[in-house]
Amino acid sequence: MKKVPIKVCVSNKQKDVPIRVQSAKKLVLCCLQYWKITTDQVYIYFLDDKALAQIHDEVFSDPSLTDTITLPIDSPGISSHPHVLGEAFISPKAAIRFLKDRSQDSDLLYEEISRYVVHSLLHMLGYDDQTPEERKKMRVKENQALCMLREKHALLSD
């Protein structure tokens, strides 16, 4: 049986940070390959704060700003056709605020947004960050993935 390539759908509906769609697709595919995850589809949406706050309100009844929202759909290992791993809604502007609040170099902007994508993918895989232990475990996985992405020159770029 012929293996069908993973369809990574990326939409950029914000103007705060230039995002190269192909760069985002490469990042997602590298992570899924690194983690040995098979799926048919993954959706990544880069949105402005207003749109993300609206989704946050619709899904969680909380209109506050956030950096990412992840909606896992089909868990890894579940048989469905097509298998949709999930959807990630990401605010690049949140990364700008994060770096500014910590007086960090804006050169780290694309790495921070890459972290948001990796973080969302981990949520799609079932990782959670509600407790300090879960956050620590998730941060380790994020850092491992970011290290791999750096080596493969697969972090987001402009």
UniProtKB/Swiss-Prot annotation:
Organism in which the protein naturally occurs: Chlamydia felis (strain Fe/C-56)
Subcellular location: Cytoplasm
InterPro entries given in the database record: MetalPrtase_cat_dom_sf_prd (IPR023091), YbeY (IPR002036)
Pfam family, one: YbeY
Cofactor(s) the protein needs: Zn(2+)
Protein name, entry field: Endoribonuclease YbeY
Enzyme Commission number(s) from the entry: 3.1.-.-
GO biological process: rRNA processing
Task performed by this protein: Single strand-specific metallo-endoribonuclease involved in late-stage 70S ribosome quality control and in maturation of the 3' terminus of the 16S rRNA.
UniProt keyword annotations, A-Z: Cytoplasm, Endonuclease, Hydrolase, Metal-binding, Nuclease, Ribosome biogenesis, rRNA processing, Zinc
HAMAP family: Endoribonucl_YbeY
Gene3D superfamilies xref list: Metalloproteases ('zincins'), catalytic domain (3.40.390.30)
Molecular function in Gene Ontology: metalloendopeptidase activity; RNA endonuclease activity; zinc ion binding
